[in-house]
Amino acid sequence: MSGTPWPEWSVGSPDPPVDDLGLGLVGAGRFGAVILEAARELPGVRPVAVADRDPARAQALAAAYGLAACPPDRLLDDPRVAVVAIATPPDGHAELTLAALHAGRHVFCEKPLATRIEDATKVLRAAAEAGAPRLTVDYVLRRNPLYALLGRLQRELLGPPRSFAFENLASDEQLGPDHWFWDRQVSGGILVEHGVHFLDAGAWLLGSQPELVQALEAARPDGRVDTVLAGALHPGGATARYAHAFDRPGRAESQWTTLDWGATASGRLYGWIPLELELDVRTDGPGLAAVQALTTNQQTALAVPGYRPSGAERISLELASRGQPGQWDLRLRATLGRQEGRGRIYRESVRAGLADLQAAIASGDQPAVTASDAWTSLAAALAGQEAAATGSAVRPASLPL
């Protein structure tokens, strides 16, 4: 922690307009900066304050955006703060979320919701109380346009896939030996800190939560776990597989997701923040017509509320007869534009998450990603950790509410 002292109160931006939601950020790191960048470009949301345990970090980020800076325990004293965005290391998420909810503040929490299921349950119960503020978790894949397109194709034609498999060959260049990522007491471990993204996405596309999880882990000689393999069995025999390895330079990174619908379709998403989708569909005349109708307007097909298209998005269809009347092989390609880079797409997905929370606050409805979603993906991740430790398949905990 920096030795920089806190001023009595570091005053930055003026009061937001009456109808704007003032946003206070806890966590002045890289992800916190992404949240501020996304929030300041969202009409009706106004960043007002930055909090961090390190005064120097808080003041530096606050100064960059013209905001107030304060210690975390004083953020809720600011009457301008209506929404608390939490971007600290994971071990602080549950405590900060509970404090914000109990203080009547809405919460936008970076994943995971907690590192322990007991703490996640406390948050779940607080969020379920009558009149409770709204809470959502930053599951950016749910707000990615290619996942939105897949969801629409499933509803119109394909139904849930039979299998979901994610492969993450990731860089460790920014994860030095002392980084909190490697400390399971702080990060929760790979499946909790990072894997919940994909456990949630897999359950969302498969339309069910896993019934059984099995997993393996590999550690370096110094004890740091850098590789995790997990498999999940879903109701009806659907399967999901998750592989994470944080063990290579950035130039060798590679991530992809494979989807399979058995005899009817198969597909692949490229990038952990997906940039491209390829989908092969075997269909008949009505199925072809459904895909063509869905993709005629690509902006509608890829639409995510709060996500601003760049103009580089494209959807193309290639068609071939299967040699039988009315039977077709269809290849769909969709791209968000590789030149855009995953940074912009990630930031727009965060913006869409904030927009969804904003809409839920205005309507009184629940956001698209709820505390229950965050709880169940954490339960699956913890089941994977237990399975790796015991060598036995584990049933995830059941949602208590």
Residue ranges and their predicted role:
Residues 220-223, 240-352:
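NAD(P)-dinucleotide binding in Rossmann-like oxidoreductases
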Residues 114-175:
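A contiguous active-site-proximal alpha/beta segment in oxidoreductase catalytic domains
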Residues 104, 131-132, 237, 391:
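Glycine-centered short loops/turns at secondary-structure junctions
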Residues 109, 115, 135-137, 242, ...:
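Hydrophobic residues in well-ordered beta-strands that form the structural core
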Residues 177-253, 271-273, 372-375:
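Rossmann-like dinucleotide-binding domain that binds NAD(P)(H)
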Residues 1-65:
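N-terminal Rossmann-like dinucleotide-binding module
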